Regions:
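Feature activates predominantly on carbohydrate-active enzymes
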Residues: 1-51, 55-58, 64-68, 96
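Catalytic-core regions of glycoside hydrolase
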Residues: 7-8, 58, 68, 77-213
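Short, histidine-centered active-site or binding-site loop motifs used for metal coordination
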Residues: 35-37, 74-76, 179
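Conserved beta-strand positions in the central sheet of alpha/beta enzyme cores
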Residues: 32, 71-73, 210
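Non-cysteine beta-strand/loop elements that form the S-adenosyl-L-methionine
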Residues: 1, 73, 144
Length: 213
């Protein structure tokens, strides 16, 4: 997934994943598999063609054991946004070619408004959230994940409105709600209820919400 993203799965691990896919189907909870090829021994423009073949071979392995949704992660990584958008485009095309695979999900470098200057992703333009997401305007079916205005941000109408009307050209966010995860403070557990302080009632202008346990 991350540090070993170039390595294909052995048969025993594929069987474990097949069982997880089946457990998801049985519980009406879709299993999605993610790859992060931008951090450890990252894909580059010079290795792109060979690395794309490796990624697709791995996707084929997972498809053959029942995985029907895939996630491409670029969070907390360096590199230029054009390379990330290029890989999104090619993997989106692979997903579409299968006919029964759900839309590709993408976790961007700018996964929250606060992340806009955490890496030098720009291609010469000003580093703004809107300029970042312009690189994905030609990929309307790729689902863009978003944690809000900051890493651990509540699901609020304001951030969905910002994403749709200011940060993108009418796209709806697929929110990655960083709750009740506690990796920003290992000294305590998040034990409170998920009330309106975490998830506002009556939300609109969003594609979906997943929580991070």
């Amino acid at each position: 997934h991350n540090s070993q993203w170039r390595e294909l799965y052995p048969a025993d691990r594929l069987e474990e994943i097949r069982q997880m896919v089946q457990a998801g189907q049985d519980s009406k909870c879709r299993f999605a598999w993610a790859i992060h090829p931008f951090m450890h021994s990252a894909i580059t423009a010079s290795t792109y063609d060979a690395d794309l073949k490796v990624i697709i071979a791995k996707f084929e392995q997972l498809y053959n054991v029942g995985v029907r949704q895939f996630v491409l992660s670029a969070d907390d990584a360096a590199g230029k946004v054009s390379l990330h958008a290029r890989l999104c485009k090619d993997l989106d095309a692979w997903c579409k070619s299968k006919g029964d695979v759900y839309n590709l999900c993408f976790v961007p470098q700018v996964y929250c408004a606060g992340a806009v200057n955490w890496s030098s992703w720009s291609e010469g333009e000003a580093q703004t959230v809107a300029n970042y997401f312009k690189h994905f305007e030609s990929l309307p079916d790729v689902e863009l994940m978003w944690t809000g205005e900051s890493v651990c941000y509540p699901a609020r109408q304001s951030t969905f409105n910002n994403f749709k009307n200011s940060y993108t050209n009418g796209r709806e966010a697929f929110m990655w709600l960083n709750w009740p995860v506690n990796d920003v403070n290992h000294a305590r557990l998040v034990m409170g209820p998920g009330d309106s302080a975490i998830l506002e009632k009556g939300l609109t202008n969003f594609m979906g919400i997943v929580t991070n346990p």
